C-alpha cells in the first residue's frame, strides 16, 4: 500500500501531534512494523523525523486552502491508497479513503476557550472530517464518548488507540545546558502550552502558599501562552511574594527539558479538559509523581499513579503540592502504581494498531 500522511505537524517546533507522529514513524521504520508499505509524507515545508517515508513538499502556507485543495491534487497524482490525517481535519473532497485522528474536541466542548473564528473553523472541519473518514482514531475512551455525543458519530466507527510514552529521562552523564542554572531545592514542574483550561493562575496561587512555608520550593512553568481570553502569566508571577522562585520557560529545547525533568520532584497539571494528558504520563515514566485535577480523563489516563484535587480549591492544591514534594510515604505509594499505568502506553502497540486501521480503511 501507498500510505499518505499529512505531516505538517512535523515541521517547525515540535507539538503534541508532532511528537505523536514521531513516535509512530519511528516504529514504522522497523521492518517488523512496516509490512512492505510505502509511506509518503506531505507538508508545506521541510519536516523532521521523516526517515520512514518520502517527503513531498507542496507549495502554500499549510493552511486550510492547502489542506482542501493542494493536498488532494497531490494525493490523486501519487495514486495513494489511504490518507492518515493526524491533526483533527482532513481533505473533505477526495476519493482517497481517510483515517482522521481527533485527540480531543475541546473546541466543541468548551468553545469559550477559543476565538469565535478559530473555534468555528475547528468545529466545522473536525465534524466534517469525522463524517467523511472511513475511521476516526482517538486516544482515550473519554474522547470517544465526547466525539459520539457532540458530533453524532457511530461508536463503531471510532477506534481508541492510546499512544506510547517517550520518557524524558536524560542520558547518563548528560550535563545541564550552560544557560539553565537550576538552584538547589525541591522543584515542581509544569510542561505544556498554557491554556485557560490548565489553570496556571491557580497553580501559581497554590505554589505561593507552599513556598511561603518552604524556602527550598521552586516552580518551573514550561510552555507558551495560548490563553483565550488572554491571561497575563507574567503579571501573575510578578504579583507573587515568591516570584523569584517561579521560573517561566516559554520554550525549552530538548536538552533543557530533560534537565528540568531530572531536577523535578513533582509534576503538576491542573487541566480540566484533555484528550488524554501526555505530559503527566511522561513525568511518571521519569519517576516523577503527578498532581492532576480530578477529571474522568485524568483518572482514565493515570489511575492510582497520581494524586487528584478538585477544581478551584487553592488550599487543597497547596496541600497536595506539599505532599508531592515532601511526603516520602505518599510518593512511594504513587510510584508503586506507576508500572501498571505505564504498561498501557506502548509505541510498538500503538503503531501496529494504527497501521492495521489504515490497512482496513483502504
Predicted stretch roles:
Residues 1-362:
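Carbohydrate transferase catalytic cores enriched for Leloir-type hexosyltransferases
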Amino acid at each position: 500500500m501507498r500510505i499518505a500522511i499529512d505531516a505538517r505537524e512535523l515541521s517547525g517546533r515540535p507539538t503534541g501531534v508532532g511528537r505523536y507522529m514521531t513516535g509512530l514513524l519511528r516504529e514504522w521504520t522497523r521492518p517488523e512494523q512496516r509490512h512492505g508499505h510505502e509511506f509518503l509524507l506531505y507538508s508545506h515545508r521541510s519536516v523532521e523525523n521523516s526517515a520512514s517515508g518520502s517527503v513531498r513538499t507542496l507549495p502554500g502556507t499549510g493552511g486550510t486552502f492547502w489542506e482542501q485543495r493542494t493536498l488532494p491534487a497531490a494525493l490523486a497524482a501519487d495514486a495513494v491508497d489511504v490518507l492518515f490525517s493526524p491533526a483533527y481535519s482532513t481533505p473533505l473532497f477526495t476519493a482517497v479513503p481517510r483515517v482522521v485522528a481527533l485527540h480531543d474536541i475541546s473546541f466543541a466542548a468548551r468553545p469559550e476557550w477559543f476565538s469565535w473564528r478559530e473555534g468555528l473553523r475547528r468545529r466545522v472541519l473536525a465534524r466534517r472530517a469525522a463524517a467523511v473518514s472511513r475511521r476516526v482514531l482517538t486516544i482515550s475512551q473519554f474522547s470517544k464518548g465526547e466525539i459520539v455525543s457532540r458530533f453524532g458519530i457511530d461508536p463503531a466507527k471510532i477506534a481508541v488507540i492510546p499512544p506510547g510514552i517517550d520518557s524524558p529521562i536524560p542520558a547518563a552523564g548528560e550535563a545541564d545546558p550552560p544557560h539553565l542554572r537550576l538552584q538547589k531545592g525541591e522543584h515542581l514542574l509544569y510542561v505544556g502550552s498554557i491554556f485557560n483550561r490548565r489553570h496556571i493562575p491557580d497553580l501559581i496561587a497554590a505554589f505561593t502558599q507552599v513556598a511561603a512555608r518552604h524556602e527550598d520550593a521552586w516552580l518551573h512553568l514550561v510552555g507558551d501562552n495560548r490563553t483565550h481570553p488572554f491571561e497575563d502569566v507574567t503579571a501573575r508571577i510578578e504579583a507573587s511574594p515568591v516570584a523569584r522562585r517561579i521560573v517561566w520557560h516559554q520554550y525549552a529545547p530538548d536538552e533543557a527539558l530533560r534537565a528540568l525533568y531530572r531536577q523535578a520532584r513533582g509534576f503538576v497539571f491542573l487541566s480540566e479538559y484533555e484528550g488524554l494528558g501526555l505530559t503527566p504520563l511522561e513525568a511518571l515514566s521519569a519517576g516523577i509523581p503527578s498532581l492532576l485535577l480530578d477529571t474522568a480523563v485524568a483518572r482514565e489516563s493515570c489511575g492510582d499513579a497520581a494524586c487528584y484535587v478538585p477544581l478551584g480549591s487553592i488550599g487543597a492544591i497547596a496541600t497536595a503540592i506539599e505532599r508531592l514534594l515532601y511526603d516520602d510515604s505518599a510518593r512511594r505509594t504513587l510510584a508503586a502504581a506507576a508500572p501498571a499505568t505505564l504498561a498501557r502506553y506502548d509505541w510498538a502497540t500503538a503503531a501496529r494498531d494504527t497501521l492495521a486501521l489504515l490497512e482496513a480503511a483502504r
